[in-house]
Amino acid sequence: MKTKKLLAAVLATMLVLTAVMLVACNNTDDMSNNIYEGKYATVADEKAVEQLQSDVQKLATDSVDKDGKPAALGYRLAITVKGSTQKDGTTVNIDGKIEGLLTTDEKQNVSAQLSATISASTKNPETNEEEAIAFKGNAWAFSESNKAYADIDFQMAGTKISGKYCFDLKELLGNAGIEINPGDIEIDEAMNQFKSILADTNTKIYVDGDNKYKIEATVDGTMVTAYLFKTKDGNICFKLEGTADGLAVSVDLRPTQDKVKSPEKTDEYGKFDGKLPF
């Protein structure tokens, strides 16, 4: 049962980890290109801060159309997690990367296409031996049809499992203890919180030219660094770096016009019945 829940959690994380961080950017699909790199030696003056606040507000307005209804949006994303954390008194080493595409339509249906490579290791306190988990795969999810697909290679405790599986999306998320309703995502509230951070006297803001910002702030007692990059057509890309429970986390979100496509030959994906050879 523990293994089933672990696999469900890994797959669900691939599908929805970034669904609560929706922002708008545009036309910078090459995630290997570090568009945020710059010489952030200049402290932002009052005019630059006002422009930054205006740009942040645009993130909220881009999420709706002229009639105030949800707009169709698309995002390229890259997430990295690396470091050591404590779990039940044991040190767990984690190194993971997730990349992909996340889109929403006017009806707030969410589609995702993600690839992930995740490895974790910990020492078994009973045997004092190192135990490792390795996961590699691709996943697709469609809230409108309530379907999810995964092409996975999973290894744990010396046992391997690989294959193509089809899931009931709600059941998958339920097994992982995750419940996400895109309609509950309050873009305006998130942007207002961000603007409050910008107004904090302890927040440091640096600029490089008129289209790059670096923000150093404390959020809930944790130091975070955010980068904003404004494209030529005025849209915003966003990167967040921080540390949580000993893990270095980076989230990079950029706009795209691409659409999520179903995997080829979906008939090759067998329904997952929860039975694993572990």
Can you name each region flagged by the protein language model?
Residues 5-17:
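Sec-dependent N-terminal signal peptides
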